């Protein structure tokens, strides 16, 4: 299987998000990379499902809460920017204050 660097990045994010989901299911609080991966994956998958940029900006901020993260993680993440593929092309989605 020959993957482009971008495809490899997307696969890595998807795998990291899956690890984060399993940890949340076990009651483990997420660290910084896990939180970013979970938010990023939600935005990418929502875009593939045909949702709008505005919808994904809002939905990205509803993926995880402060209580699901280790202490200080929410304060470290002011915004998450994701290049996502929408039905009409690739667009940059910025999620401001994604952990509330």
Curated annotation (Swiss-Prot):
This is Urease subunit gamma. It catalyses: urea + 2 H2O + H(+) = hydrogencarbonate + 2 NH4(+). HAMAP family: Urease_gamma. Pathway: Nitrogen metabolism; urea degradation; CO(2) and NH(3) from urea (urease route): step 1/1. Pfam families: Urease_gamma. Its EC number is 3.5.1.5. Keywords: Cytoplasm, Hydrolase. GO terms for molecular function: nickel cation binding; urease activity. It is found in: Cytoplasm. Belongs to the urease gamma subunit family.
